[in-house]
Amino acid sequence: KDKNLVDPSWWPIFETIDKALGGAGTASTPSPAAAAPAAPATPAAAPAAPAAPTAPVASKPTKAPATPSPAPATPKANTVEPAEDKIVPLRGPAKAVVTTMEESLTVPTATTVRAVPAKLLIENRSAINKYLASTRGGKVSFTHIIGYAVIRAVAAMPSMNVTYNVDEKGKPVAVHNAHVNFGLAIDIPRPDGSRNLVVPNIKGAEQLSFREFWDAYNDIVKRGRNGALTIEDFRGTTVSLTNPGGIGTVHSVPRLSKGQAAIIGVGALEYPAEFRGLSEKLITQQGLSKIITLTSTYDHRVIQGAGSGEFLKLVEHYLLGGDDFYDAIFRDLRIPFEPVRWARDNHIDDEHEISKVARIQQLIHAYRVHGHLTAATNPVGYKMRSHPDLKLERYGLTLWDLDRVYPTGGFGGAERLPLRTILERLHEAYSGSLAVEYMYSEDPEVRAWFQERLEHGATKPNREEQLRVLSKLVEAEAFEHFLQTKYLGQKRFSLEGGESLIPLLDAV
């Protein structure tokens, strides 16, 4: 045995054992570094020495022979039935998309991102669509309003409408486009389940009012879905808009096509991720707003990051009602009342200030007294009517209070109502198409009689009542036609808009 295999502290122990065995059993083996090769020799027999008594040495247990384990089973091959891949040639619009995307790789781009609170956008869009549904019909989408804000921002910042090109000598030039040709990314599903992306544009979009832009937008989308677009609809796009937020995408960095200045991406309308688990009641109490993420991907050869950042800031300014943005939309759509205004949530100390409940009672009283002054009673003319005593800000109320529930003191037959419902009933009762003035009466019973019938909300007539009204109108029209044909040349007075009095008399 080689003592060099163990720690030197063990060497004296092994030397003692060697001496006890007479030096015959465990001669120290020199280390390989010091050992020299020796010639083979037959060792001489040493005389037997008397063996000293030694302690019995415990023998090591003999390991049982290992039982051979069975060979692992060969795993079954993961095979599928043989099938051929389907190869579809890209033709027509699909091939054009490939060409456009490959060309976009030659455009050096950068992207600016901005999160915008969408509370005011949601409130004013809701007010617009409710009015349109009750009058001439139609619907305004979020993309309509955001797209119009983008167009106004580009018109205010011409530096965002600059494209890159080369002159006849091959030298780079910056093209300051005279008009904003606003492209709209339209996703068109096909019968086979595939989808096609087309980006037609609205020429000279900066010259359009919101109503004109709304009509042009709807027309180009309709023609796109019906396959009626022409080459001219795609030519000359300078700035385009894509809205993947409609399918839940929060943030998008789209490709910028060659020849365009910028493409604006619109994300999903959602609460921030950290607040999505909160209840609606807590969200309302805390004054949390949904946000919308806007991205501006631009040609970095002619547009710089600071300009893109200022551009998105201006878009946010418009979406928060800056420069009478929503007032212009309401006027273009001939909506007779003012839009909702942006304001920070107003916290009121009930111990030292008039509570919001008392302020709401003041607002209700103001509508009863002055509401008839804002009623839209002129069916042939248009005027946006307002009264300072009917504005929320006069009472320290904001758009953040609209969904909060307050005691009403019995208004509308309810003890507690959201401020939104209170305002809707007040507007319907006093500021709609019917003007009612009765607060001059000194008789409280008379005032209570009007309030009970006006402030509970209108009840829509059922189908039978609607058919009865229609039948009465048809009878009146038929009778007038009879008089016109029976008594020719006779002087008489026609209904001339007095038809609405007929169902009123019938109900009485």
Predicted features along the sequence, with ranges:
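Short, hydrophobic/aromatic alpha-helical segments in well-folded domains
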Residues: 219, 363, 504-508
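Short helix-loop boundary/capping segments at the starts of domains
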Residues: 5, 19, 23, 99, ...
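C-terminal catalytic/motor cores of large multi-domain enzyme assemblies
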Residues: 9, 42, 52-349, 353-356
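Extended, charge-enriched "interface" segments that sit outside catalytic cores
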Residues: 27, 343-501
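General structural feature for long, well-ordered alpha-helical segments within catalytic domains
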Residues: 6-9, 93, 97, 124, ...
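Hydrophobic/aromatic-lined pockets within catalytic cores
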Residues: 18, 133, 155, 368, ...
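Intrinsic-disorder/low-complexity detector
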Residues: 1-56, 346, 350, 354-370, ...
